[in-house]
């Protein structure tokens, strides 16, 4: 992709998000070292959701901060070059979805349909929190010299980043 084409780049962004089964998470920890983890992710009506347990240190850090950095990344087995795996990194604020809401039930059903029967087991566990990610912006990397700035909640492709 040589030209800056926001429409084509948006299609690639949407493909990366649609194929993602998990999202990597990083948040500041208590001792200023980042806490990192990974959790399944689903999309519903254009929004991204995670359902992690607060028993994990990275989830406690995320809940305390109310925001975190996230990344979806191309599967290693599909990458043309391991040094240039396609990835989408973004910062997001978190919105906790109340357990007694229609949204909670609908998203839990999507988790079960997407990721299998484990959701039926953990759905009622009180240490799990349903979180909607509200992106603020980020970067999409599609290969060498193919990094693009993403802006806003829709992660609009706004700029080709040509230098560090």
Regions found by a protein language model. Give the residues of each.
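An N-terminal domain-cap segment
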Residues: 1-63, 71
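C-terminal edge-of-domain segments
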Residues: 2-7, 11, 109-110, 114-164
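Conserved hydrophobic/aromatic beta-strand scaffold that supports enzyme active sites
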Residues: 22, 36-40, 89-91, 128-132, ...
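Short, structured beta-strand-loop surface elements
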Residues: 28, 55-117, 135-137
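Short coil/turn motifs at beta-sheet boundaries
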Residues: 32-34, 63, 83-85, 123-126
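Short glycine-enriched loop/turn motifs at secondary-structure junctions
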Residues: 42-45, 88, 124
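Beta-strand-connecting loop/turn residues
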Residues: 46-47, 66, 127, 136
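Surface loops and adjacent helix of pleckstrin homology
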Residues: 53, 73, 143-145
